Amino acid sequence: MVKKFEYRGKPAEELESMPLDSLFRLFNSRQRRSLTRGITDGKRKLIREIKDARAGKEGNPIKTHLRDLIVLPSMTGVTVNVFSGKEFRPVEITTEMIGHYLGEYVITNKRVSHGAPGVGASRSSLYVPLK
């Protein structure tokens, strides 16, 4: 049997129909504080684009630099390209992401893989004969 997703005991369908002020009470204090301080114009525009994409009006991929946007239930089922600092990475928004920031799903740094040290990198490598 497949487990149904619930956020704080509420199913996803109920979360979508819930008014925002009662939804905010379910979030942690950090997310609640961020949302009650107000949604900026850029965030409001992105939320509108996501709603249009869910309705089938938006044709272009949605790109954003807003990594501090909290995922709301009205955003689920849409792919958003989030900027990692170098490129836009696609993020498929699912119900498990509700209450988290978009930036949590796009890593901004990558693992460093060092190459072989060059000549003069250490004192002993000065005397290594060149090829």
From Swiss-Prot:
Q: Which residues cross the membrane?
A: none
Q: Which InterPro entries match?
A: Ribosomal_uS19, Ribosomal_uS19_CS, Ribosomal_uS19_euk/arc, Ribosomal_uS19_SF
Which PROSITE patterns does the protein's record reference? Answer: RIBOSOMAL_S19
Please give the GO cellular component terms listed in this UniProt entry. cytosolic small ribosomal subunit
| Gene Ontology biological-process entries | ribosomal small subunit assembly; translation
A molecular-function term among this protein's GO annotations: rRNA binding
| Tagged with keyword Zinc | no
Q: Which UniProt keywords apply?
A: Ribonucleoprotein, Ribosomal protein, RNA-binding, rRNA-binding
Q: Which NCBIfam families match?
A: PRK04038.1, uS19_arch
Question: What job does the chain carry out?
Answer: Protein S19 forms a complex with S13 that binds strongly to the 16S ribosomal RNA.
The family note in this entry says: Belongs to the universal ribosomal protein uS19 family.
Cite the PANTHER family for this sequence.
RIBOSOMAL PROTEIN S19P FAMILY MEMBER, SMALL RIBOSOMAL SUBUNIT PROTEIN US19
What is the protein's name according to its record? Small ribosomal subunit protein uS19
Species of the source: Cenarchaeum symbiosum (strain A)
Q: Which gene encodes it?
A: rps19
